[in-house]
Amino acid sequence: MSGDTCLCPASGAKPKISGFKGGGLGNKYVQLNVGGSLYYTTVRALTRHDTMLKAMFSGRMEVLTDKEGWILIDRCGKHFGTILNYLRDDTITLPQSRQEIQELMAEAKYYLIQGLVSTCQTALQDKKDSYQPVCNIPIITSLREEDRLIESSTKPVVKLLYNRSNNKYSYTSNSDDHLLKNIELFDKLSLRFNGRVLFIKDVIGDEICCWSFYGQGRKLAEVCCTSIVYATEKKQTKVEFPEARIYEETLNVLLYETPRVPDNSLLEATSRSRSQASPSEDEDTFELRDRVRRIHVKRYSTYDDRQLGHQSTHRD
């Protein structure tokens, strides 16, 4: 049994220095105050290994006690519970953080627990060999995996879908260049905002090039960069590079960096208010259109430069 309560000694009280008589007291519980953290454990656990603690509780070293009988150890008590677990049964669950493992190893060295020191050294070496990159971009393998990534993310999400195999026609002259520019912009944004936004790639989706933006598990906007145009007597696929719009939507998702809590005002900040809907729209139509903002790029004919569509913002 252990605790983490800070002990405030009474004013004027002085610790008592004495030798601990541990003979025949293996099952006796002792009270330890390690840097203000309080622990109860048995003498048997403290003397199982040949450590400094065994020397303290076998009478070979003097110990300090306060007037309430707590044995004082002038060390940080943060990892002492972990040390006790190791002393009891030689097993341990190490912290995930490299820094905390280093802290634990420093305490193990102080108490001369060589087995625990070796375990920490091995774990640190393994972490060094399996170094995780600072900017880690997952490539999704299924819709289920995508849903889980987005739902579990504590950050806003930006997804780039690009899949040339979905194309049924030839490309316009600038499409390949624009596709590369979209990918390059994705990489640039990943390097710039990887600490604040989760960037994911999708190479199995049904589009050729499409950006999606999510906040608090909800899809906020979509920028579709492809369209079908007519050149002479055949159809062609056109890929655009709406750089300004992509930057705008990426900055918009940063509004959703806050912890995932219900925040209707934030969710409505980038969506059209109900009062702006035309009177002719019924409730079902409004709910459908209010679901997500989709942005389609300008579409031009490569045959006679007639504009087939215009830049529009609507909800799907």
Swiss-Prot record:
Kindly state which keywords UniProt assigns to this record, in alphabetical order: Cytoplasm, Endosome, Nucleus, Phosphoprotein, Ubl conjugation pathway
- SMART domains linked: BTB (SM00225)
Under PROSITE patterns, the record lists: BTB (PS50097)
The record ties this protein, via CDD domains, to: BTB_POZ_TNFAIP1_BACURD2
List the InterPro entries hit by this protein, alphabetically. BACURD1-3, BTB/POZ_dom, SKP1/BTB/POZ_sf, T1-type_BTB
PTM comment: the record says:
Phosphorylation at Ser-280 by CK2 facilitates the nucleus localization and increases interaction with PCNA.
Region ranges (Disordered): 268-288
- Any one Gene Ontology cellular component term annotated for this protein: endosome
Which residues belong to any copy of the BTB domain? Answer: 28-96
The organism's place on the tree of life at top rank: Eukaryota
Keyword Cytoplasm in the entry? The reply is yes
List where Polar residues composition bias occurs: 268-279
Q: Which GO terms describe its biological process?
A: cell migration; immune response; negative regulation of Rho protein signal transduction; positive regulation of DNA replication; proteasome-mediated ubiquitin-dependent protein catabolic process; protein homooligomerization; protein ubiquitination; stress fiber assembly
Q: Which GO terms describe its molecular function?
A: cyclin binding; identical protein binding; small GTPase binding; ubiquitin-protein transferase activity
Localization per Swiss-Prot or TrEMBL: Cytoplasm; Nucleus; Endosome
The pathway where this protein functions is: Protein modification; protein ubiquitination
Q: Cross-referenced Pfam families, in alphabetical order?
A: BTB_2
Where in this protein does the record say Phosphoserine is found? 278, 280
The record's listing under SUPFAM superfamilies reads:
POZ domain
Family assignment from sequence similarity: Belongs to the BACURD family.
> What this chain does, per the record?
Substrate-specific adapter of a BCR (BTB-CUL3-RBX1) E3 ubiquitin-protein ligase complex involved in regulation of cytoskeleton structure. The BCR(TNFAIP1) E3 ubiquitin ligase complex mediates the ubiquitination of RHOA, leading to its degradation by the proteasome, thereby regulating the actin cytoskeleton and cell migration. Its interaction with RHOB may regulate apoptosis. May enhance the PCNA-dependent DNA polymerase delta activity.
What quaternary arrangement does the UniProt entry report?
A: Component of the BCR(TNFAIP1) E3 ubiquitin ligase complex, at least composed of CUL3, TNFAIP1/BACURD2 and RBX1. Interacts with RHOA; with a preference for RhoA-GDP. Interacts with RHOB. Interacts with PCNA. Interacts with CSNK2B.
This protein is called BTB/POZ domain-containing adapter for CUL3-mediated RhoA degradation protein 2
Gene name on record?
Tnfaip1
